[in-house]
């Protein structure tokens, strides 16, 4: 049944009150609204019609079609005497995206107000849900007051108050208000939530998107924790808002106790500024801040910090022994188009330990890389060019030994097959500049054990290095190299299932080396077998390396009742000439040679472009894989490499002795193997081995295991490596790294890790943490002790950090250095 409103006065006035009732399952009526009306339109005198969904024979403005209203109720009551209309029983009003539910809703046509009573619920278009005992609102829902109110937002924040008043469609004042971002306990909703803020008044300014609290108390589990006469925070819908952030606290023996309150300035939607001053009781005010801006094609930021230290004696004998200290950092990334982007990342400091001393970097950071870059990514190509400056952050770093580097890399795979196979090109350019030679000792007597000056003692002093006791990690002077390689390969499978992959490549390297004067006792002194000592002076270099080869694989597959197994023997024959100019090309990027199963079948096993493998070689091995029904997967690899004829590149060291003592320097290499077993998706064991080819003694061993069982996660890594004095490892290295985490409950977890140096019988890294995290609150206490930052003679770097986060309000950190200094 569709019903229209009767006139406010007229021939029906003899009956002061009339009720229309129904006995069926519900009725609905739709009425047109005036542009600003909320509930019911005010009718002009006339006769009401009941045949249509809109008013007829009335004089009223045209209703906004976007603000129609649907009302359902058990009964509609007209009060002509007081000019009121009431909907009674299971009332539901749908208007402009909002839904109002109540036991009774009364519209006062004179005052243009609406009063809802009894289990009132208002759902707003933005997802907010308001509940109250009573609501009195203006006709457009803009203003009004509510009693015994509760507001639930879509992002699970909640307000409650004994009364709330809304004015100007903007400001809502909650009397005796409560705010929380925590959900009540499902089983015991009567229990206090984890945290909540109670205030005499909570004021929400919707236009400012701010919430103001007056006479506020922060409670945890219903118990008062902190009192604030006044504070404010952005409302939960705001991601960026001008105002103060959560405070920060520090404690450090050299700096004293530190505290600060950052201020965030939301200048515009595309830019902001954070001013974050910290005052330290021993050193004074550290001024720091960050500017961020997003442009149409990217974004950038600038960070700066500076301090005039009040007590420089705390840093006596250290890089921080100066009055004025500071830094500037900046990074940016910009998109040129869908394939190209460019950017930078730069750091400039007054001294190398400023960032660590004042907690401006992570505990494990040992260097900062300043770089500018341009990269491109296509369907079959990759382009990258960048310049890099490495800033050492340790007390023992000598910046003159650290290079400035420029690199260029380009890879392209041809779209159309060439002779039926895949072909492509690789290009690399590298430029290295260094002020002083970087010598490293090959024994305990000549090794650099650290020190404030950063100059190695003993036989590896820059003025008197002995090539039989020292190797050159970095060449002084300037070095540029351009390399290009063309490659081709094609895989053929015959009727028997054998896989044949012929391949070929051609590479050319051209370089210019301007090596600063090296000590004559290094360049002219006695050398070890296989050493090729770098010489001083200018040199233009060129070398070429053509390669042809054949890769053969023959997989055998067996399907059994217990599972499926695959055995695949593999052989790789490589024919090429000898490597030329060994030792004349400074080796800057190919020093990290580790011979294992990962590079057993690599055509060139060097890690970079400064060395190229020469001489003909045969690589052989067998791979075994078994998928056990219900019992996991086993995988194993074993292999060996043979130098067939020509010069074995790995038997000839360069300035860093790369290749010597690698297991590849003899005509028959060491054996390499890998074995792994995964009984389930949550449990895995991996082992890697290298055995001497003559006596089968273990040269290199790595064992790793990791598992995740319900709430428990464990991992352990064990490594043992025989001495390689010609590479600077003059002692046996052996250690264990273990990590564990356990989820005590859905919200509580603990984690920790230990690195134990077996060779030195000492723990050199320890970490532990306990964390609480739920839907509204985070608490983390973390401890880290690490010797690797300061060096073994300077003691560990011990740090404790407490992090507390209240969802929607922010996060604060308390960081303290304990024990030895943070140097």
Language model regions located:
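Outer-membrane beta-barrel proteins and related beta-barrel translocases across Gram-negative bacteria
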Residues: 134-137, 141-145, 152-173, 177-186, ...
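Local alpha-helix boundary/kink/capping signal
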Residues: 13-14, 43-45, 508, 575
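Immediate N-terminus of the mature polypeptide
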Residues: 3, 50-51, 78, 256, ...
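N-terminal amphipathic/hydrophobic interface segments
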Residues: 48-176, 196-204, 209-211, 215, ...
């Amino acid at each position: 049944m569709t019903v229209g409103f009767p006139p406010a006065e007229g021939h029906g006035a003899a009956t002061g009150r009339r009720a229309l009732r129904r006995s069926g399952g519900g009725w609905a009526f739709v009425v047109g609204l005036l542009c600003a009306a909320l509930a019911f339109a005010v009718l002009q005198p006339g006769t009401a019609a009941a045949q249509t969904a809109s008013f007829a024979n009335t004089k009223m403005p045209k209703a906004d079609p976007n603000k129609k209203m649907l009302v359902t109720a058990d009964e509609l009551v007209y009060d002509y005497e007081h000019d009121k209309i009431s909907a009674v029983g299971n009332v539901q009003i749908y208007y402009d995206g909002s839904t109002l539910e109540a036991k009774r809703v009364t519209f006062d046509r004179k005052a243009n107000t609406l009063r809802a009573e009894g289990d009132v619920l208002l759902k707003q278009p933005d997802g907010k849900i308001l509940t109250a005992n009573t609501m009195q609102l203006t006709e457009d829902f803009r203003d009004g007051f509510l009693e015994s109110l509760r507001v639930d937002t879509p992002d699970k924040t909640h307000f409650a108050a004994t009364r709330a008043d809304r004015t100007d469609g903007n400001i809502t004042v909650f009397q005796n208000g409560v705010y929380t971002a925590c959900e009540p306990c499902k089983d015991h909703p009567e229990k206090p939530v984890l945290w909540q803020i109670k205030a005499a008044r909570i004021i929400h300014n919707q236009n400012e998107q701010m919430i103001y609290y007056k006479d506020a108390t922060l409670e945890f589990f219903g118990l008062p924790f902190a009192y604030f006469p006044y504070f404010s925070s952005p409302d939960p819908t705001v991601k960026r808002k001008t105002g103060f952030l959560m405070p920060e606290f520090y404690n450090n023996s050299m700096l004293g106790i530190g505290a600060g309150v950052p201020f965030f300035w939301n200048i515009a939607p595309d830019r902001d500024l954070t001013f974050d001053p910290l005052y330290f009781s021993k050193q004074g005010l550290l001024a720091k801040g960050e500017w961020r801006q997003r442009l149409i094609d990217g974004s950038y930021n600038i960070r700066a910090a500076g301090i005039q230290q009040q007590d420089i004696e705390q840093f006596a004998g250290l890089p921080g022994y100066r009055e004025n200290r500071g830094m500037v950092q900046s990074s940016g990334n910009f998109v040129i188009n869908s394939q190209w982007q460019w950017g930078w990342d730069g750091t400039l400091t007054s001294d190398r330990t400023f960032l660590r001393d004042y907690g401006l970097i992570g505990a494990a950071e040992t260097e900062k890389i300043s770089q500018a870059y341009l990269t491109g990514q296509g369907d079959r190509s990759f382009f990258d060019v960048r310049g890099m400056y490495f800033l050492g952050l340790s007390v023992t770093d000598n910046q003159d030994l650290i290079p400035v580097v420029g690199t260029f890399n380009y890879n392209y795979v041809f779209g159309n097959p060439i002779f039926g196979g895949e072909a492509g090109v690789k290009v690399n350019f590298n430029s290295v500049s260094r002020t002083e030679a970087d010598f490293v000792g090959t024994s305990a007597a000549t090794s650099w054990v650290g020190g404030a000056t950063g100059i190695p003692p003993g036989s590896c002093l820059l003025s008197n290095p002995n090539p039989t006791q020292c190797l050159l990690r970095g060449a002084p002077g300037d070095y540029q190299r351009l390399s290009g390689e063309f490659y081709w390969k094609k895989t053929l499978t015959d009727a028997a299932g054998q896989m044949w992959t012929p391949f070929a490549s051609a590479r050319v390297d051209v370089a210019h080396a301007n090596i600063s004067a090296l000590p004559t006792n290094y360049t002219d002194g006695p050398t070890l077998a296989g050493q090729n000592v770098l010489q001083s002076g200018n040199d233009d270099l060129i070398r070429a390396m053509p390669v042809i080869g054949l890769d053969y694989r023959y997989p055998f597959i067996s399907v059994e009742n217990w599972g499926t197994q695959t055995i695949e023997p593999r052989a790789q024959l490589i024919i090429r000439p000898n490597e030329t100019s060994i030792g004349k090309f400074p080796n800057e990027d190919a020093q990290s040679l580790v011979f294992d199963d990962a590079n057993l079948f690599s055509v060139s096993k060097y890690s970079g472009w400064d060395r190229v493998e020469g001489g003909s070689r045969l690589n052989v091995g067998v791979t075994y894989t078994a998928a056990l029904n219900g019992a996991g997967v086993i995988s194993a690899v074993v292999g060996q490499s043979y130098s067939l004829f020509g010069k074995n590149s790995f038997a000839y060291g360069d300035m860093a002795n790369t290749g010597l003592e690698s297991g590849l320097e003899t005509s028959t290499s060491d054996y390499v193997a890998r074995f792994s077993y995964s009984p389930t998706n949550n449990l895995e064991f991996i082992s890697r081995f290298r055995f001497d080819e003559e006596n089968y003694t273990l040269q290199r061993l790595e064992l790793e295991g990791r598992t995740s069982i319900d709430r428990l996660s464990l991992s352990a890594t064990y490594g043992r490596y025989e001495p390689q004095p010609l590479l600077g490892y003059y002692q046996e290295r052996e250690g264990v790294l273990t990590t564990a985490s356990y989820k005590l409950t859905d919200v509580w977890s603990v984690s920790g890790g230990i690195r134990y140096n077996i060779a030195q019988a000492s723990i050199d890294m320890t970490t532990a943490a306990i964390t609480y995290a739920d839907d509204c609150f985070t608490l983390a206490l973390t401890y880290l002790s690490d010797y690797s930052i300061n060096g073994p003679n300077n003691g560990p770097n011990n740090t404790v950090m407490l992090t507390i986060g209240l969802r929607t309000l922010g996060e604060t950190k308390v960081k303290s250095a304990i024990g030895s200094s943070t140097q």
